Amino acid sequence: MVSVRLSERDIRVVSKCAVSKWLTTGQLARLYFPKVTPDAVRKSLRRLVEAGFLVVHREHQMAEALHGLGPKGKALLEAKGVTAEVTRKPPRQIEHMVGINDLRVAVEVNPTQVAYFFASWELQGLGWVHPLIPDAVVGLRLPERRTFLVEYDRGTETLPTLVGKLRGYEGGLSGIPFRALLLVTDTAARLETLARHVRKEGFLRRMLGCVLAELSAEGIDAALFMDLRRINPDKSTLRESAE
């Protein structure tokens, strides 16, 4: 392994990979290299991989690289009092994890608005006791702090299974006040299908929907979110929904 001198940005990259498990090159570029060329981003990340702070995985030659925490990254964080685990191999459902981290990036690129973002795999370590585990819990300053629970649907679950999970949110979660449940899908067609089922079930809990690609492109503060309980709803911002 080569020896490198770490910058503050390097440390933030390593820390974020530890929390997020696996981040794509593009996700890291959006978070930490907004005005840097793709080649320069890859060079910076390769340097951290070669030094052992990160590990890299690529499903095939044409796939985007995934970056996780390496052994020297683990030692770096533990020296700062942060418990961390080296990432060995992406999970079988890596597409779902990448999608959740796309949500993370869409939230965290606006640091003045975000209060917190916790993915499902972080919640147990924070004392989450409910059997129902959302894909993410997001806190936003709108300007008052508001909490949103997030479900990311790739269309791989059956509709009865997903609707059954949504039904679990209807009565709320003890000790976890939340403004709304955000349903994020990969396609507009899937979102419309879910909206029809939400209306059919007659849910009272506010459920706001959007498409992941639009959220990634425009950010969490954009007017993207539709109230799925309504027929032909207008798109609004989360700030407007919190008023």
Regions found by a protein language model. Give the residues of each.
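Nuclease-adjacent, charged terminal/linker segments that flank catalytic cores
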Residues: 1-87
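Non-catalytic C-terminal interaction segments of nucleic acid-processing enzymes
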Residues: 2-5, 11-17, 25, 156, ...
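Active-site metal-binding core of divalent-cation-utilizing nuclease and nuclease-like domains
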Residues: 57, 92-93, 105-149, 154-164
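A short, highly charged nucleic-acid-interacting micro-segment common to nuclease
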Residues: 85-101
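Well-ordered, non-membrane alpha-helical segments in soluble/globular domains
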Residues: 98-101, 163-167
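Metal-dependent nuclease catalytic cores in nucleic-acid-processing enzymes
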Residues: 101-107, 172
